[in-house]
């Protein structure tokens, strides 16, 4: 009865909402499409002025019960609906009956629970008459992890017809010369500057991706120093530190080709699904499916002017320390192994995933401890221990070491309107303290206010010395947030000087 499109990040749901607007924007169908996540305000139907009470009650009930024909949401929200024990999780669960669910970028799930995911999805599809479509650039065959019958149909019988077609396969050249040497940030900078010099006349869009956030910051400062103030090249930095506003102010001009000469330094947040088309890429190696995702950001529209895109891989930070529990970080499964370079070139990811599945079965699925499958199904699932099931199936493990902080300042939006963080914060406080307002109206208005607050929201490490002005629950607010920005970019050094430290990864 419903269609769910599920993405790894909230921003991708909004991005695809805009894509659907170009298709259905002039029809009534666009009103049936809703984005459901923590960033998007609750949407009502009709005119609020005609009957406010009815408007707000229906809007809240629609959100709580997912009463929309077409829903765009995130992996986290979907898995809470499927396995969560909260009130709203339970209220929306029945909407999965008879639905079509499209799971995009499935390789981004924690592979420690791939087996459990496949077993549950297979069972739910049968019991609830769901059609689940799994999508990914690399598409692991997770049915291999399930003992017994798994009702899986491969929609593309001959994927090589597309992946090996010259238009697709030859659009990007992978270069491994930097993997042959002990790379440093200074050596990488020289290499990038050489490529910039070669493209000085024609221009180019260069994407440089690091695993660690601090490394991205360090390289950004090195490049800024090398370019100087008079350079024609736009130098941008995009990490998990950036707010939604900052992220879009960087990506939109790149998408629309406003900048002909641009260097975007980033962490891996640009890999999965972000709609940008770059000419040259540099990437610190990690998981093989991450490398393929990165290739999808290069020469996205095909070969330009007879020149294919090119990606230089290097090995700087130790990815295995970051992805500690990910079996895909076995050295033999990375680009450090020449066999994996062939797999990447020929798109033979089934060969790669066969080895990953072997590791999963041998290292985890056969365990008899609490981490093993047998223990989980006999002690948690069979005994209907819903809290333990919910905990096991969390896609993102709970992080108790960070807090959210609102850095108030004034932002000019694309349409010319101004958003004042301090005024939005005051409005947020007023709504919370208004005990006379109807519950439905309050929930809807709070969702709208929180959506605006997200423009000023940042995550930092938990620290009792945070120099905040106000605190509501565990949400901190700094009135003069502008002091922590320089050239429209968060000043990490200034923040850390005031004992506010960003999350490292």
What are these regions (language model features)?
Residues 2-24, 37-40:
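Conserved Walker A/P-loop ATP-binding site and its immediately adjacent core
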Residues 26-83:
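Inter-Walker segment of RecA-like/P-loop motor cores
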Residues 34-46, 211-214, 235-248, 266-271:
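Conserved helicase motor
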Residues 64-68, 85-99, 261:
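Short basic/glycine-enriched coil/helix segment immediately N-terminal to the Walker B
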Residues 81, 263-278, 293-301:
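SF2 helicase motor core recognition
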Residues 90-100, 107-165:
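Post-DEXD/H (motif II) to motif III coupling segment of the RecA-like Helicase ATP-binding lobe
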Residues 125, 190-204, 209, 214, ...:
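C-terminal helicase lobe and adjacent C-terminal extensions/tails of nucleic-acid helicase motors
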Residues 138-199:
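Interdomain hinge/linker at the junction between the two RecA-like core domains of SF2 helicases
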């Amino acid at each position: 009865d419903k269609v769910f499109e599920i993405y790894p990040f909230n921003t991708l749901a909004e991005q695809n909402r805009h894509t659907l607007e170009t298709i259905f924007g002039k029809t009534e169908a666009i009103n049936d499409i809703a984005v459901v996540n923590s960033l998007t305000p609750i949407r009502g139907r009709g005119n609020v002025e005609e009957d406010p009470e009815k408007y707000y009650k229906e809007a809240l009930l629609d959100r709580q019960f997912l009463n929309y024909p077409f829903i765009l949401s995130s992996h986290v929200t979907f898995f809470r609906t499927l396995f969560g024990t909260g009130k709203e999780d339970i209220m929306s669960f029945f909407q999965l009956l008879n639905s079509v669910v499209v799971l995009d970028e499935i390789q981004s799930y924690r592979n420690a629970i791939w087996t459990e995911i496949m077993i549950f999805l297979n069972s739910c599809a049968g019991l609830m008459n769901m059609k689940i479509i799994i999508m990914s650039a690399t598409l692991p065959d997770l049915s291999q992890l399930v003992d017994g019958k798994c009702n899986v149909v491969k929609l593309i019988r001959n994927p090589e017809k597309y992946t090996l077609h010259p238009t697709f396969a030859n659009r990007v050249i992978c270069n491994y010369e930097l993997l042959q040497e002990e790379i440093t940030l200074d050596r990488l900078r020289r290499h990038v500057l050489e490529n910039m010099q070669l493209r000085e006349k024609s221009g180019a869009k260069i994407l440089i991706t690091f695993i660690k956030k601090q490394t991205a910051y360090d390289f950004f400062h090195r490049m800024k120093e090398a370019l100087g103030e008079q350079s024609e090249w736009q130098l941008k930095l995009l990490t998990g530190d950036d707010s939604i506003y900052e992220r879009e102010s960087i990506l939109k001009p790149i998408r629309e080709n406003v900048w002909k000469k641009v260097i975007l330094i980033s962490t891996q947040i640009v890999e999965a699904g972000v709609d940008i088309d770059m000419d040259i890429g540099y990437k610190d190696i990690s998981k093989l499916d991450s490398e393929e995702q990165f290739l999808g950001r290069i020469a996205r529209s095909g070969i330009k002017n007879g020149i294919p895109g090119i990606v230089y891989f290097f090995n700087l930070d130790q990815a295995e320390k970051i992805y500690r529990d990910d079996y895909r970080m076995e050295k033999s499964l990375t680009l450090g192994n020449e066999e994996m370079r062939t797999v990447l070139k020929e798109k033979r990811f089934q060969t790669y995933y066969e080895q990953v599945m072997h590791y999963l079965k041998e290292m985890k699925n056969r365990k008899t401890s609490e981490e093993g499958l047998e223990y989980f199904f006999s002690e948690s699932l069979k005994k209907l221990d819903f809290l333990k099931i919910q905990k096991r199936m969390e896609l993102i493990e709970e992080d108790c070491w960070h807090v959210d902080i609102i850095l108030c300042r004034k932002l000019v939006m694309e349409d010319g309107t101004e958003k004042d963080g301090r005024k939005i914060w005051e409005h947020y406080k007023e709504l919370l303290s208004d005990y006379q307002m109807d519950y439905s109206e309050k929930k809807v208005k709070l969702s709208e206010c929180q959506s605006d607050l997200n423009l000023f929201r940042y995550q930092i490490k938990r620290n009792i010395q945070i120099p905040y002005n106000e605190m509501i629950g565990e949400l901190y607010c700094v009135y003069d947030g502008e002091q922590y920005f320089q050239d429209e970019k968060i000043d990490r050094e200034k923040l850390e000087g005031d004992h506010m430290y960003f999350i490292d990864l």
